[in-house]
A protein has these predicted regions:
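Ferredoxin-type iron-sulfur electron-transfer modules and their immediate structural context
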Residues: 1-215, 219-220
Length: 220
């Protein structure tokens, strides 16, 4: 990995080996103890084969003898920036407030800091993995270059424990894995298809009217 040789155990993935050796491969969908999905595409790495190079998801690709892996090649960075941009572009992610296609990265940062106290900013501003990756790879969202109005989705507030704002969801699937594989409550799952996809409770109802026991595993 990145020019260094590492030992691995049968059953480990590339991401497992990297994390065990303090090599940072960013990821948004992987949750330890659950099945890898590769849904976010942020953990992709470049794998050298005898016939050339290819991109693979490190969270779902088994480690093998003789693998040559690059985690931050120019091609990898380009792809990560693209996927992060798509996620920022897909919902109401106000960490890229004021961004535009022709705005410099420095100007964007200054404008974002000036807007930091605005009420419409995301409640987890400054404590968000997606935002951290956007800053790390200098992604402002709006991949198409066109301004898109924030997604308007009713906020689910009918219970005192968990408030659900699906306009912030990037469909990483961590909450689904936590509910179905760690707690085995089977209260939430992926629903609908394409750009209408979202995390649903029961038969499309609210958490309050589903089999959710409000253990909090999905939030953690």
């Amino acid at each position: 990995i990145n020019g260094h040789v590492y030992q691995f155990r049968p059953g480990q993935t590339i991401l497992d080996v990297a994390q065990e050796n303090n090599i940072d491969i960013p990821n948004l969908c992987h949750l330890k103890g659950t099945r890898a999905t590769g849904a976010c595409r942020v953990c992709i790495v470049e794998l050298e084969e005898s016939w050339g190079k290819k991109l693979v998801s490190s969270c779902s690709s088994p480690a093998k003898n003789g693998m040559i892996v690059h985690t931050e090649s120019p091609k990898i960075v380009e792809y990560r920036r693209f996927y992060i941009g798509l996620m920022l572009d897909s919902g109401n992610h106000n960490c890229d407030i004021g961004a535009s296609a022709d705005e410099s990265w420095t100007d964007f940062q200054i404008e974002a800091m000036e807007n930091e106290q605005k009420e419409e900013l995301c409640p987890v501003w400054g404590d968000c993995e997606l935002q951290a990756l956007a800053y790390r790879y200098q992604v402002k969202g709006r991949v198409s270059g066109r301004h898109r109005e924030p997604v308007k989705v009713p906020i689910e507030t009918d219970n005192p424990f968990i408030v659900r704002d699906m306009s912030r969801c990037i469909l990483c699937g961590r909450c689904v894995a936590a509910c179905n594989e760690l707690q085995v409550n089977q209260a939430i799952d992926f629903g609908f298809r394409g750009d209408k996809g979202k995390i649903t409770a029961g038969t499309g109802t609210t958490l309050m009217n589903s089999s959710c026991v409000f253990c909090g595993e999905c939030v953690q």
